[in-house]
Curated annotation (Swiss-Prot):
Subcellular location: Cytoplasm
Chief localization: cytoplasm
UniProt cross-references to CDD domains, sorted A to Z: Asp_decarbox
Family: Belongs to the PanD family.
Catalytic activity of the protein: L-aspartate + H(+) = beta-alanine + CO2
Transmembrane segments annotated in the record for this chain: none
Quaternary structure and partners: Heterooctamer of four alpha and four beta subunits.
Catalytic residues, chain numbering: S25 (schiff-base intermediate with substrate), Y58 (proton donor)
UniProt organism field: Dechloromonas aromatica (strain RCB)
UniProt function note: Catalyzes the pyruvoyl-dependent decarboxylation of aspartate to produce beta-alanine.
Residues where Pyruvic acid (Ser) is found: S25
SUPFAM superfamilies: ADC-like
Protein name, per record: Aspartate 1-decarboxylase
Pfam family, one: Asp_decarbox
C-alpha cells in the first residue's frame, strides 16, 4: 500500500510580497527551501491563516537570507503582504518508507528566520 503523507512544512511564514504580474509561483528564501527539503519547481500547497484561502502552486528560489515569501501570478489574489501562511509539500511513501518517515517541520519568527526545526507535531490536548 502507498500513502500520501506530509513531507515538509514551513509553519506560519509571513508573506512579504504579492506580485500579480510576476510569472506564477511562490518565491521562497533559499535557506527556508533547503531547511524544509523543498526543491525548486516542486508543487506546494499554501494555506492562508488570515483569510482561509487554500491553493496549490510551485516553489521558486528567492535570495538566500532575504526572508522573502512572494506569492506570484494569479495566486497573488489569495495572499497579501503580512498574511500568515503555512506552506506544505506531500509525497507518496510505501510501507517500508513509512516506517522511517518523519516530515521536515520548520518554524520561523515574524521575519521568516528559522527559530526551530522538528519532525513531529505534538498531540493536541482536549480542551
Amino acid at each position: 500500500m502507498q500513502r500520501t503523507m506530509l513531507k515538509s512544512k514551513l509553519h506560519r511564514v509571513t508573506a512579504t510580497h504579492a506580485d500579480l504580474h510576476y510569472e506564477g509561483s511562490c518565491a521562497i528564501d533559499e535557506d527556508l527551501l533547503e531547511a524544509a527539503n523543498i526543491k525548486e519547481y516542486e508543487q506546494i500547497d499554501i494555506w492562508n491563516v488570515n483569510n482561509g484561502e487554500r491553493f496549490t502552486t510551485y516553489a521558486i528560489r528567492a535570495e538566500r537570507g532575504s526572508g522573502v515569501i512572494s506569492v506570484n501570478g494569479s495566486a497573488a489574489r489569495r495572499a497579501a503582504p503580512g498574511d500568515i501562511l503555512i506552506i506544505a509539500t506531500f509525497a507518496v511513501y510505501n510501507e517500508v518508507e513509512l516506517a522511517k518517515h518523519e516530515p521536515d517541520l520548520i518554524y520561523v519568527d515574524t521575519q521568516n528566520r528559522i527559530v526551530r526545526r522538528g519532525h513531529k507535531i505534538p498531540v493536541q490536548a482536549a480542551a
